[in-house]
Amino acid sequence: MSNTESLNIGKKRGSLTIYIGYSPGVGKTFEMLSNAIELFQSNVDIKIGYIEPHQRDETNALAEQLPKITTNFTKHGSHHFQYLDVDRIIEESPTIVLIDELAHTNISRDRHEKRYMDIEEILNHGIDVHTTLNIQHIESLSSQIELMTGVHVKERVPDYFIMSADVLEVVDISPEQLIKRLKAGKVYKKDRLDVAFSNFFTYAHLSELRTLTLRTVADLMSDKEKVRHNHKTSLKPHIAVAISGSIYNEAVIKEAFHIAQKEHAKFTAIYIDVFEKNRQYKDSQKQVHQHLMLAKSLGAKVKVVYSQTVALGLDEWCKNQDVTKLIIGQHIRNKWRDFFNTPLIDHLMSFEHSYKIEIVPIKQIPVELKMNKSPYRPKGKRFAIDMLKMILIQIICVMMGLWIYQLDKHESSTIILMIFLIGIILLSIWTRSFIIGFLAAIINVFVFNYFFTEPRYTFEVYRFDYPITFIVSILTSILTSALLKQIKFQYSITKKQLYRTDLLFQFNDSIKQTYTVENLLINAGYQINQLLQQSITIYVINQSKVIKTIPLQNHIDNTTQQHEQALSWVIKNERQAGATTDTFPGINKWLIPIGTSPIKGILAIDYQSSQVINPYDASILESMLNELSLAVENVTLLKQTRESMLQAERQLTHSNFLRSISHDIRTPLTTIMGNLDILVSHSKDMSIIEKEQLLVHSFQESQYLYLLVTNILSLTKLQSSNVQIKLQPYLVSELVEEIDMILERRHLKKRITVSSSVNLQFIHIDSKLILQALFNLIENAVKHTSTDTKINLSIRYASYEQIEFAVIDEGPGISLEEQQKIFEPFYTGSNKYFKDNQKESMGLGLYLVQTILHKHQSNLQYKPNQPHGSIFYFNIYTDFNEGDV
């Protein structure tokens, strides 16, 4: 779900060059423009995308020497501002584009919140970018620089983007030279110099910033070189940082990042959820979310773990994940809070562990953050409510005890103690604090002593065994309370885990039973709606276009122009956008692309930018999206595999067809040409009988060719999806007469008999096709039986509404194995009775008959003849509706 991954959009990613300086005024833009002019004079296609408007004549003069890409304007208040036109840069696609002020925050947030995101999109389209940056705008250094200078920097660039730069060029001048430039008014107007010199631009600050810049760039280049040479090294230290809702946690994360960078370690951010339900916990979730996003932007892998206490969860996770160093923030001492709660560091140190613990001191936290931090507010309201619950249960126990005591003053002590123990159990279930159970256990003893032991209504004790009873009672109550709290917590964890497991199981089950991308997206949308309780719209994508919009829960999708732009951007860049992201943050939908390049769909979740997904739901959603993407790719791959198999089958069929037809056409043509050649060359030397034999043989070969071509043309015509056949009423007796005429012409009357018990009956058929089907069946019987085998064409009523046509022979029949294949195209069978002067069938006859009959809503069937032989038959309805099929 990371928004920081670069995507391949069909082009190689462009090269990023950053001109970095330690302060405004060192000459970054001037240096960038000077180098650009040299490249332009060398015929490099280089253009200015955006240069910050300057009061410096030298910089403006350089900018005039380069071609510019037109910028856009936006109105903010009563002022108009220029801003980068990303689409125009991508459209013009120069080799190199110059873009000033990398850390700038866009005034118009219609597309990206930050300029570095604009640059990242341009890089992804294969365009090289040269840009400028001051050291104080690097995310991980901002807190450190704030400590140095006292100036809080709001515009920041994440470290991963700086580390992705191909070239880091330091623009450096001495602090003395910079101060001279400032005094000369070359950086700021002279009326602003007093403020500048009193805050940021002091010699001490500039010297520290210069040193930090040189060291940071050197470290970055060194780190890149080490990564390049040690890329295959698997043994790396593992640095973990504890995430919390504390305002100090931001600086702790940045310090942990620096440590991980220096040690070239695996970096993980770990958040321990202890299932608090109070308002303070809910309010901290937004801060936790921001810290998790910060850790992600610094390259950390984020983990959410559930535990009874933060210390226990951290310790168990660090041991299981082979963490070498755990980074936590310094504990802020508070005597009242520490009296009831063990500080995290003390709790961690009580465990046996092999990892190191490093504490980031509070003095490293910027002064402004300390001042803005809200004071610690103890959980007084919740504690007061729990105290009232304890008092109520105590009163109930006393009232019940007094009633039982009145019934039996001598034997009621045990029962009354049990009532107080039950009160402890109820209190442990009803309240959250362990302290309440502890206090109740002690108070119970004093209440019991006061009301139910002699002398009553005093705290004096006469019997020597009562102190022991009281101690045992206290210990029993405390242990019972502790065990119940533990069981209650385990129940909460189990309930959460069961909810997660059940939700993921339902999700996996729903997508496993789905075999289309559209249905996968719909099922996933309903499951995610159940998780987040937000309306969802599905966009099905094909060939980079939205082909279908499916709103769920009867949700009306009011798509604005900005929504359309965001959708197009997500399709093009294959990254998340909208609410909860920094791209198109103004729209009220969170757009999540599904599937790898190209994406197959988009889930649009209704969300406001102010809303935050808690870490628990975020982890479930991430699992769901990963499973969905995998399922979509599997379905797509399965579809592609099926299409490939069908294509291969078509190619094989086509190849078999060409091979078969070339043989079947070439052989009779060769015979005909040979016979005619003999007649032309040797006609004078041949008798009339010999000439007739050659002519008859040539005629038979021509008939075979005619039948072959007719079958192929008919089959091709019938298989065409837009071909219709014309059904007309036709007398069965006329059909019989035409069959007799064909048999007469083919000299088959002696072998084939036609028996019909149907005469004056109309059937609705395409007569030419049915005649062709019947003749193919007769031809098939002739080819597959011996010359003395009788063949019968039977026409009779199969029922009141159907007439059966059957071709019956007394040949060898067809084996069970071959019966499964006889209607397949190009299947020729054993051809046991073919003679030398007969042509082997092409295997299309029965297939063509079946195709013709399907057009008549009928079906060719086979059954064995008794005692031997074959019967091919089909039925035609007598009342079939006339019309086109």
Curated annotation (Swiss-Prot):
Observed phenotype of the null mutant: Inactivation of kdpD results in decreased transcript level of cap.
GO molecular function: ATP binding; phosphorelay sensor kinase activity
Subcellular location, record wording: Membrane
Phosphohistidine: modified positions: H663
EC category name: transferase
Domain Histidine kinase residue range list: 660-880
Membrane topology: Multi-pass membrane protein
Principal location class: membrane
Catalysed reactions listed for this entry: ATP + protein L-histidine = ADP + protein N-phospho-L-histidine
Role noted for this protein: Member of the two-component regulatory system KdpD/KdpE that regulates the transcription of a series of virulence factors through sensing external K(+) concentrations. Also regulates capsular polysaccharide production. May function as a membrane-associated protein kinase that phosphorylates KdpE in response to environmental signals. In turn, KpdE functions as a transcriptional regulator by direct binding to promoter regions of target genes including spa, hla, aur and geh.
Protein name, entry field: Sensor histidine kinase KdpD
Organism field: Staphylococcus aureus (strain NCTC 8325 / PS 47)
Lineage of the organism: Bacteria, Bacillati, Bacillota, Bacilli, Bacillales
Gene field: kdpD
